[in-house]
UniProtKB/Swiss-Prot annotation:
GO biological process: one example: 'de novo' IMP biosynthetic process
UniProt record similarity statement: Belongs to the GART family.
The enzyme's E.C. designation: 2.1.2.2
Residues annotated for (6R)-10-formyltetrahydrofolate binding in this entry: K66, M91, R92, L93, I94, N108
SUPFAM superfamilies found in the cross-reference section: Formyltransferase
The organism's place on the tree of life at top rank: Bacteria
Keywords: Purine biosynthesis, Transferase
List of residues binding N(1)-(5-phospho-beta-D-ribosyl)glycinamide: G12, S13, N14
Protein name: Phosphoribosylglycinamide formyltransferase
Active-site residues, as the UniProt record annotates them: H110
Function, as annotated: Catalyzes the transfer of a formyl group from 10-formyltetrahydrofolate to 5-phospho-ribosyl-glycinamide (GAR), producing 5-phospho-ribosyl-N-formylglycinamide (FGAR) and tetrahydrofolate.
Catalytic reactions of this protein: N(1)-(5-phospho-beta-D-ribosyl)glycinamide + (6R)-10-formyltetrahydrofolate = N(2)-formyl-N(1)-(5-phospho-beta-D-ribosyl)glycinamide + (6S)-5,6,7,8-tetrahydrofolate + H(+)
EC top class named in words: transferase
Length: 188
């Protein structure tokens, strides 16, 4: 069994999708050790509890520095013998302490066809751009914002009659297929 930890900051729909793939056996030989979140009121906590997944709530403001915050996370991850970190809507840049401890073992999913539309509101950026396609990207995490090596992408059309909400649903559907597929290929 490969032990993974999933990091999320918000609703946790990608987190729950991965957990459901593990529970159903579609993601074999993977154990989700815990959800790590940086917001005490994040909805992902409710999703984790529903699936009996332990939750670590660590808000960076509780620590003297980003280094202290990340060193605390590394100690928790090491206690659980975590081998891979899966970012699923975790809205913080990963710093040098976490990167050094899990080099080449941190994945992220981003709702655009990187390198386009890095950062926040990527779907909104694509929607307002005039582009006719967008999509989702899974990539390795490095010290930049959505700059790590791209592993795989999936795309969808942006139709003239799509609302932003419809486009968000299209991209979310891609993510729900893409992330478990990449995890199955990479996390071993």
């Amino acid at each position: 069994m490969v032990k993974i930890a999933i990091f999320a900051s918000g609703s946790g729909s990608n987190f729950e999708n991965i957990v459901e793939h593990v529970e159903s056996g579609k993601l074999e030989n993977i154990e989700v050790t815990a959800l790590y979140t940086d917001h005490q009121n994040a909805f992902c906590i409710d999703r984790a509890k529903k699936h009996d997944i332990p939750v670590y709530i660590n808000e960076p403001k509780q620590f003297d520095s980003k280094a202290a915050y990340e060193q605390h996370l590394v100690s928790l991850l090491n206690e659980d013998k975590v081998e891979w970190i899966i970012l699923a809507g975790y809205m913080r840049l990963i710093g040098p302490d976490l990167l050094a401890s899990f080099e080449g073992k941190i994945l992220n999913i981003h709702p655009s066809l990187l390198p386009k539309y890095k950062g926040i509101d990527a779907i909104g950026q694509a929607y307002h751009s005039g582009d006719t396609i967008t999509g989702s990207t899974v990539h390795y995490v490095d010290c930049g914002m959505d700059t790590g090596e791209i592993i795989e992408q999936r795309q969808c059309d942006i139709r003239p009659d799509d609302s932003k909400e419809q486009l968000e649903e299209k991209v979310k559907k891609l993510e729900y297929e893409l992330y478990p597929s990449v995890i199955a290929k990479i996390v071993k």
